[in-house]
Regions:
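Glycine-rich phosphate-binding loops that contact phosphosugars or nucleotide phosphates
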Residues: 65-241, 427
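Helicase-primase coupling helices
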Residues: 299-385
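Active-site phosphate/pyrophosphate-binding segments
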Residues: 162-324, 329-332, 417-445
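Short, charged beta->alpha transition segments
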Residues: 62-63, 120-128, 251-255, 327, ...
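Short, solvent-exposed amphipathic alpha-helical segments in soluble enzyme
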Residues: 92-95, 127-130, 154-156, 189-191, ...
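Glycine-rich phosphate/diphosphate-binding loops that line cofactor/substrate pockets in enzymes
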Residues: 59-73, 126-135, 253-263, 314-319
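C-terminal helical/tail subdomains of lipid-metabolizing enzymes
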Residues: 378, 384-445
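Extended, charge-enriched "interface" segments that sit outside catalytic cores
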Residues: 1-69, 341-345, 349, 437-445
Length: 445
């Protein structure tokens, strides 16, 4: 279960203002629950935890078992934005940090990602890896025409067909796409690919608990049922029309701080396994709130590492910051610090302490220092990193994002600004139909 602690904000806001913002958050929650707000045709994510059928997970497990029987030891997941960040976040959080370097036979394939950039070096080096491995691919796109994943898929599809033959390739490629339309759906039907559906009413950044995230997480060997259970408990908790609703608490405080001049929110973690939670969170809030000249700018850091780079700015820089700290109460591993008779490093006072105890005290000390430096602290805690708690975090942040966007007065479920770079890129690449725009752009260069 996710717990919210706003004590680190008490010296920056007063109770009356907070209560007023709670009322605003509850009003926004009502709009979300009654589906009467902007973007209400993209609310299919709200009940995914409680309504996802077990047969969907079983289908994903069948893909896993089929590929295991073929000896597949490398799966390339192709997608961008919400089509890869949720799965990447889950796999990074749940996997052994050095799983790909440990000796011994792996029980699950290595999962790598493509289609989230246009780097020629990246895709070429990925191909180098594929040539040494037994490969399969998951391509994720509603349309099949998004440039980055479409380019990567064209190259990877050609490689798999050339290596294994067209018929076998059709059993090594799975598509997650629209149910009825789009280039990828048409190609999948033509080639005979197994497909999973992205529903029309779920946007990419809210799709981690659909086949977009579920399939790669199952392929990675993790317990999606536990993840959905954690998310389902948060679905219930975050629907409550009361101040005890954790999503309401978080949305209310971050909007109050925003209106008080804190325009940048930094998501802080103290475990490198959660680095990609920050990347997923940045897309979720950046695309949902950054529009109409409004929005909190989302950033992320990994402490204690980034205390030795960004720590100086956070402590002493411009006072436009707030921090949301992800606290993990218990470690999944245990290691104590040994005594050293020479004590040249002066650390014998730590003898017998767990490394995680040092991490916890670094977290507490940093919170207090940053409060003293004028940076409010919102704390989000979970008991440990596992599937259940990760599912709870996913749903908590999604629900709070919808509430927060409505409080801000924007549509949290569209992303019109994303099209601007695409139009320029298409024009500069010579896509038919963009000739006039290309001419205008080239005059500026």
């Amino acid at each position: 279960m996710v717990k919210v602690n706003l004590g680190g904000c008490s010296s920056f806001v007063n109770d009356a203002d907070y209560k007023a913002y709670v009322e605003k958050a509850l009003a926004a929650l009502d709009v979300l629950e009654t589906e009467t707000g902007a973007g209400n045709d993209f609310l299919g994510w709200k009940h995914l935890p409680s309504q996802t059928p077990d047969c969907l997970i079983s289908e994903c497990e069948q893909v896993r078992d089929s590929w295991k029987a073929k000896g597949v030891d490398l799966v390339v997941v192709i997608g961008i934005g919400g089509s890869y960040l949720g799965a990447k976040c889950a796999l990074e959080a749940l996997s052994h940090t050095f799983a790909n370097s440990l000796k011994g036979e792996r029980s699950v394939p290595q999962i790598v990602f493509a289609g989230h950039n246009l780097s020629e070096e990246y895709i070429s080096e990925l191909m180098d890896l594929m040539k040494e491995r037994n490969c399969a691919a998951v391509v994720i796109s509603k349309s099949g025409t998004t440039t980055e994943p479409a380019v990567a898929f064209r190259l990877i599809k050609q490689y798999i067909e050339q290596t294994y033959g067209v018929k076998e390739a059709s059993e090594r490629i799975v598509a997650v796409t629209d149910a009825h339309r789009g280039a990828l759906k048409s190609l999948s039907t033509q080639e005979g690919y197994k497909t999973f559906v992205i529903e029309d009413n779920v946007g990419g950044r809210f799709s981690v608990l659909t086949p977009v995230g579920i399939l790669p997480i199952v392929l990675g060997g993790f317990d999606v049922r536990a993840m959905l259970k954690g998310a389902a408990e948060m679905e219930e908790a975050c629907a409550r029309n009361c101040e005890c609703n954790p999503a309401v608490q978080y949305a209310a405080m971050r909007n109050l701080l925003y209106d008080n001049g804190k325009k940048v929110e930094i998501l802080v973690s103290y475990n490198p396994k959660l680095q990609y939670l920050g990347e997923w969170w940045k897309q979720l809030y950046g695309e949902s709130e950054g529009k109409d000249g409004k929005g909190i700018f989302p950033a992320s850091v990994s402490f204690t590492t980034d205390l030795h780079s960004m720590g100086q700015y956070i402590q002493d820089g411009m006072r436009m910051l707030m921090e949301t700290v992800i606290t993990v109460e218990n470690s999944n591993r245990s290691m104590t610090i040994a005594n050293d008779p020479q004590n040249l490093d002066g650390l014998n006072f730590l003898t017998g302490k767990h490394v995680e105890e040092c991490n916890a005290m670094a977290e507490l000390g940093t919170k207090l220092a940053h409060i003293d430096g004028g940076v409010p602290q919102l704390s989000i805690s979970v008991e440990r990193i596992n599937e259940y708690n990760l599912g709870a975090l996913f749903y908590f942040f999604e629900k709070a994002c919808g509430i927060s966007g409505y409080m801000l007065g924007v549509n949290p479920f569209d992303q019109p600004g994303v099209e601007a770079y695409k139009k320029n890129m298409f024009a500069l690449l010579g896509k038919p139909g963009y000739e006039e725009q290309a001419k205008a752009l080239k005059e500026r260069l």
